[in-house]
Swiss-Prot record:
This is Ribonuclease Z. Its EC number is 3.1.26.11. It is an enzyme of class 3 (hydrolase). Its cofactor is Zn(2+). Zinc phosphodiesterase, which displays some tRNA 3'-processing endonuclease activity. Probably involved in tRNA maturation, by removing a 3'-trailer from precursor tRNA. The active site is at 67 (proton acceptor). NCBIfam families: PRK00055.1-3, RNase_Z.
Length: 307
C-alpha cells in the first residue's frame, strides 16, 4: 500500500503543483490503483509515473469543484486507448453522474470498458473481503465528503512446519486449517485450525479529508488511522481566510491529526501563494503541533507500512 501524490495544489494549476489528485497504489493487495480526486491534467501527471491507467479500478471524488473533477473526462477516455477493459467505478456527490455522462456524450467518447457511477451519501460506500471505504460529510460550502480506506485484518500465515512435524501432510485439510476450522483427521485426531495460525496482521488505514473547515466528523473518521491526508490550503496566520473560504490551515490540520491520534499527517491542497521556502514553513507550522507531519509535493511517494 503506497500513496502517490499526483497533484498537491489548490484551485488552479501552478508551475510547481498541479491541482488535486492522490493515487492509492494497491498493487500487492489487489493489483490495482485507486484515485482520490482527479483535477485537470491528472492524466498528464500519471505519464510521469509508473501507474498504468488500465490498473485504475476506482476513483473517489470528494466534491464537485473543478480543481477536483476536471481531469475525469480526459482520463476516462484515454483509459480506453490504453488497454482498459476492466470495470471502473467512480464514487462522488450528487452531480458526478451528470457531469461524467454529459462530458462523454457531447464529445462522443466511446469507452471500451464498463463504467459505473455511484452518487454517495454518508456511510459505507464500498466493502469487500479486503477493504471497507467509509464517507462522512465535511464542511466546504457544497456537498463534500472525506473518505477512510480501512484494510481488513489479514489472517495469520499457516504454521506449516508445525503441521508437518505432527505428520499432517499438505493437502485440502490445510485449507480448512487456514480458515480456522476444527478438523477431524483421518487418524481420529481433532485439531483447532486457529492453533496453527500466526497472529493476524492488523489492517492499515488512510483517511482523505477533501476540502474542509475544521470538522468533528472528520476527526472521528480519522481516529487512530495510519495516515491522514489533510488539506492545508492556508498558513496558520491566514486562519480567517481559511474559514471564509471553507478551508483549513496547517495548524488546524495538525490539531485534527493530534486529536484523532493519527500516526502520520500529510498536508496537501496548498495554495499557490506559498512558494519555495514559504511551503517549507507550512510544514514547520504543522510539525510544531504534530511532529510526524510532512507537506506533500507533486510525485511524493509514501509507503503505508504495517504497524
Amino acid at each position: 500500500m503506497e500513496l502517490l501524490f499526483l497533484g498537491t495544489g489548490a484551485g488552479i494549476p501552478a508551475k510547481a503543483r498541479n491541482v488535486t489528485s492522490v493515487a492509492l497504489k494497491l498493487l500487492e493487495e489487489r493489483r490495482s490503483v485507486w484515485l482520490f480526486d482527479c483535477g485537470e491534467a491528472t492524466q498528464h501527471q500519471i505519464l510521469h509515473t509508473t501507474i498504468k491507467p488500465r490498473k485504475i479500478e476506482k476513483i473517489f471524488i470528494t466534491h464537485m469543484h473543478g480543481d477536483h473533477v476536471y481531469g475525469l473526462p480526459g482520463l476516462l477516455g484515454s483509459r480506453s486507448f490504453q488497454g482498459g477493459e476492466d470495470e471502473l467505478t467512480v464514487y462522488g456527490p450528487k452531480g458526478i453522474k451528470a457531469f461524467i455522462e454529459t462530458s462523454l456524450a457531447v464529445t462522443k467518447t466511446h469507452l471500451t470498458y464498463p463504467l459505473a457511477i455511484q452518487e454517495i451519501e454518508e456511510g459505507i460506500v464500498f466493502e469487500d473481503d479486503q477493504f471497507i471505504v467509509t464517507a462522512v460529510s465535511v464542511i466546504h460550502g457544497v456537498e463534500a465528503f472525506g473518505y477512510r480506506v480501512q484494510e481488513k485484518d489479514v489472517p495469520g500465515s499457516l504454521k506449516a512446519d508445525v503441521l508437518k512435524e505432527m505428520n499432517i501432510p499438505p493437502g485440502p485439510v490445510y485449507q480448512k486449517i487456514k480458515k480456522g476450522e476444527t478438523v477431524t483427521l483421518e487418524d481420529g485426531r481433532i485439531i483447532n485450525g486457529n492453533d496453527f495460525l500466526e497472529p493476524p496482521k492488523k489492517g492499515r488505514s488512510v483517511v482523505f479529508s477533501g476540502d474542509t473547515r475544521v470538522s468533528d466528523k472528520l476527526k472521528e473518521l480519522a481516529r487512530d488511522c495510519d495516515v491522514l491526508v489533510h488539506e492545508a490550503t492556508f498558513a496558520k496566520e491566514d486562519r480567517k481566510l481559511a474559514y471564509d473560504y471553507y478551508h483549513s490551515t496547517t495548524e488546524q490540520a495538525a490539531v485534527t491529526a493530534k486529536e484523532a491520534r493519527a500516526k502520520q499527517l500529510i498536508l496537501t491542497h496548498i495554495s499557490a501563494r506559498y512558494q519555495g521556502d514559504a511551503s517549507l514553513e507550512l510544514q514547520k507550522e504543522a510539525v510544531d503541533v504534530f511532529p510526524n507531519s510532512v507537506a506533500a509535493y507533486d510525485f511524493l511517494e509514501v509507503n503505508v507500512p504495517r504497524g
